[in-house]
Amino acid sequence: MVYVSNGQVLDSRSRSPWSLSFLTDFFWGAVEFIGLFFQTLVQPDLSKDGNNSASSRFSDGRGPPGFPGRRRMGRINHGAGPTPPPMGGGGUGR
C-alpha cells in the first residue's frame, strides 16, 4: 500500500515484484488463463464449475422465468394525463 510520510511517497510492499514467489504465481496464472481461453474456444457453453451452462442454467434453485404474458398493441398509455390530440392532416377539402 502506498502512503505519504513527511512529504514523501512511501511503499509498504516488502516483497520485490521479481521475487521467485511472484514469478511462480504469475506463471501459473498465465497457464490457467491460456488453458481456460482455449477450453472456452472448444466448448463455449462451459460454466465456472465445469458443467454445461445449458444443463445447469438454473442450478441455484431459481427456476425458469415466468411466461412473458400478452403483448399489448397500440400506443403506450399509463393513464397519466389526457390523451394527445389527433394528428393534423391539413384536410381543407380541396
From Swiss-Prot:
GO terms for biological process: calcium ion transport; endoplasmic reticulum calcium ion homeostasis; protein palmitoylation. Keywords: Calcium, Calcium transport, Cell membrane, Endoplasmic reticulum, Ion transport, Membrane, Selenocysteine, Transmembrane, Transmembrane helix, Transport. Residues 49-58 have a biased composition (Polar residues). InterPro entries: Se_SelK/SelG. Pfam families: SelK_SelG. The keyword Calcium applies. GO terms for cellular component: endoplasmic reticulum; endoplasmic reticulum membrane; Golgi apparatus; plasma membrane. The chain crosses the membrane at residues 20-42. Residues 48-94 are annotated as: Disordered. It is found in: Endoplasmic reticulum membrane; Cell membrane. It is a single-pass membrane protein. Belongs to the selenoprotein K family. Required for Ca(2+) flux in immune cells and plays a role in T-cell proliferation and in T-cell and neutrophil migration. Involved in endoplasmic reticulum-associated degradation (ERAD) of soluble glycosylated proteins. Required for cell surface expression of CD36 and involved in macrophage uptake of low-density lipoprotein and in foam cell formation. Required for palmitoylation. This is Selenoprotein K. It comes from Danio rerio (Zebrafish).
